[in-house]
C-alpha cells in the first residue's frame, strides 16, 4: 500500500490531528478555555461557569465500506466525547449519557454539518 506523503500514517498522528482540530474549534471559535492533557483524557474544557469537563477526542480519516465514519471510545470515562471527521473538517460532540455506554459510534457523513457542529458547541454552554 502506497501512502500519500500528506496523509497521517498512524493512529497517533490521526488522533493528535483530531485533538488539535477540536481544541481549535472549541477555543478559537467559541472562546472556551482548553488545556491539552496527556493522561486519562485528551483535553480539559473550562466552561464559562468555571466547570471543567474531561474531553476524549476520537478521530477518523477514512469512511467504512458503507460510507460512514466509525469511532471507538475505548475505555475512557470522559464527560464528553468529540468525534472529529478530519476529511470534512467538522466535529460532533456527545455526552457520556448520550452514548448510553456504547463503545462504538457510527455516524454518516450527513450527520457532520456546520449546523450540527455549532449546535453541539452551543450545547456545552448549557452544561
Q: What label would you give each PLM region?
A:
Residues 28, 37-39, 77:
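Residues that act as N-cap/strand-start positions at coil-to-secondary-structure junctions
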Residues 57-99:
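Catalytic cores of nucleic-acid endonucleases
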Residues 1-35:
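Acidic-basic catalytic patches of nuclease active cores, encompassing PD-(D/E)XK
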Residues 92-94, 98-127:
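Non-catalytic C-terminal interaction segments of nucleic acid-processing enzymes
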Residues 14-23, 53, 60-65:
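Short, basic/low-complexity N-terminal boundary segments at the transition from targeting/disordered tails
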Residues 32-40, 46-49:
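Active-site metal-binding core of divalent-cation-utilizing nuclease and nuclease-like domains
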Residues 31, 40-42, 67-71:
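Short secondary-structure capping micro-motifs at structural edges
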Amino acid at each position: 500500500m502506497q501512502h500519500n506523503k500528506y496523509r497521517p500514517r498512524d493512529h497517533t498522528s490521526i488522533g493528535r490531528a483530531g485533538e488539535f482540530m477540536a481544541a481549535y474549534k472549541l477555543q478559537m471559535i467559541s472562546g472556551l478555555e482548553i488545556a491539552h492533557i496527556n493522561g486519562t483524557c485528551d483535553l480539559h474544557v473550562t466552561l464559562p461557569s468555571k466547570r471543567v469537563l474531561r474531553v476524549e477526542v476520537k478521530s477518523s480519516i477514512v469512511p467504512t465500506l458503507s460510507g460512514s465514519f466509525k469511532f471507538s471510545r475505548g475505555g475512557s470515562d470522559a464527560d464528553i466525547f468529540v468525534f472529529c471527521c478530519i476529511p470534512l473538517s467538522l466535529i460532533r460532540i456527545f455526552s457520556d449519557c448520550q452514548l448510553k455506554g456504547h463503545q462504538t459510534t457510527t455516524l454518516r457523513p450527513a450527520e457532520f454539518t456546520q449546523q450540527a457542529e455549532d449546535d453541539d458547541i452551543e450545547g456545552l454552554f448549557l452544561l
